[in-house]
């Protein structure tokens, strides 16, 4: 199989990730639940991964990183734990349902939400967001990059303006963590939500959030914590406040190995390799008769995603043809991004997304282009 569905999850992982998970499953106990070696070893692995991620994102300290199962959980914790009736929150039409659905729930409870519009290429500039700031604006919640088009938002500019205005800035880094360098302090990010199984190259079931010192989030869950057993309330100190229950220690061990791999390989080297593959595919696909490509490719600031449609064919049918006729994996349909599809006019057709990893090759890209030419009936 040629795998071009890396924006959904990176299937090919570094060997060290697989080995770390295997070792953890054989030797890891439950962190914070005992003083025996297996429990202490788990605690050490979890702390070391917390510290590694803090360094990776330039967080103030390791305790500002809390682990979750994925970005969806992180975003629910942040959105539902920060805002209250009467608040005004600004978001965008680029968002995934993991942002939109929690916001829809808050709207029903009296939170006012404004969604910044995009241009014809699906791009949003900082001023498109910031123009909606008013005296009641409590937060800005936006993606770093669209999972549909790969278009990025200049979060450093948004963050600087938000910090100056005293507005909480929450960033969904699902598509960029591990792919694009992120410095939470330099970019003035108050809460960064990330998943481990995409660009970070870790196992599914891992994720987390960075919370800036001084930002208080109401916990979404309460329960076992391993500390303060006799208190009726869940501990309020980070990161325990946001980590009720047993953590995915096995997955976190794999995430540690994955982040180490990225740091050793160099995130800029990974980004360059993925960009080269994306442009190779884009430059070939745009010349195929009947292919319509979405997104802004006039800027270097984008994720390695090319989303397209072929004539008026249903995106699911095209993706099925690629999968069963050519063994090429892509993602069709709505991509959990309803507002973005409405903006692009692709609600009924959906779109076929090709997303690239540094583990892909130029030969695989060329094979996919040949397949598209055949499906388009426009062979050279």
Which residues are covered by each model-predicted region?
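Pyridoxal 5′-phosphate
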Residues: 1-380
């Amino acid at each position: 199989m040629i795998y071009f569905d890396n924006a959904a999850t990176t299937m090919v992982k570094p060997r060290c990730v697989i080995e770390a998970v295997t070792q953890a499953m054989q030797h890891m106990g439950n962190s914070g639940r005992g003083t025996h070696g297996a429990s202490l070893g788990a605690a050490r692995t979890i702390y070391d991964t917390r510290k590694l991620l803090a360094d990776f994102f330039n967080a103030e300290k390791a305790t500002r990183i809390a682990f979750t199962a994925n970005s969806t959980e992180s975003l629910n914790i942040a959105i539902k734990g920060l805002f209250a009736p009467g608040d005004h929150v600004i978001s965008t039409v680029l968002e995934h349902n993991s942002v939109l659905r929690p916001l829809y729930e808050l709207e029903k409870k009296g939170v006012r939400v404004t969604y910044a519009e995009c241009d014809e290429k699906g791009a949003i500039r900082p001023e498109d967001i910031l123009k909606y700031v008013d005296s009641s604006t409590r937060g800005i919640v936006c993606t770093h990059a669209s999972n549909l088009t790969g278009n990025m938002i200049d979060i450093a500019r948004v963050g600087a303006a938000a910090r100056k205005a005293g507005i909480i800035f929450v960033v969904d880094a699902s598509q960029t963590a591990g792919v694009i360098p992120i410095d939470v302090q330099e970019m003035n990010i108050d809460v960064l939500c990330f998943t481990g199984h995409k660009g970070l190259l870790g196992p599914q079931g891992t994720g987390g959030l960075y919370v800036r010192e001084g930002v208080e989030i109401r916990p979404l869950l309460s329960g076992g914590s391993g500390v303060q057993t006799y208190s009726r309330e869940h501990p309020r100190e980070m990161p325990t406040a946001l980590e009720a229950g047993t953590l995915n220690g096995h997955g976190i061990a794999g995430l540690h190995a994955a982040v180490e791999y990225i740091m050793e390989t160099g995130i800029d080297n990974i980004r360059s390799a993925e960009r080269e593959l994306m442009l190779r595919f884009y430059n070939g696909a745009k010349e195929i008769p009947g292919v319509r490509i979405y997104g802004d490719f006039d800027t270097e600031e984008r994720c390695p995603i090319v989303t397209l449609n072929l004539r008026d064919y249903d995106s699911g049918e095209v993706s099925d043809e690629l999968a069963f006729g050519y063994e090429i994996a892509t993602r069709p349909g709505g991509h959990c991004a309803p507002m973005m599809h409405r903006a692009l006019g692709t609600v009924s057709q959906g779109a076929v997304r090709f997303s690239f990893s540094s583990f892909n090759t130029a030969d695989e890209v060329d094979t996919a282009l040949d397949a598209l030419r055949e499906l388009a009936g426009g062979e050279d």
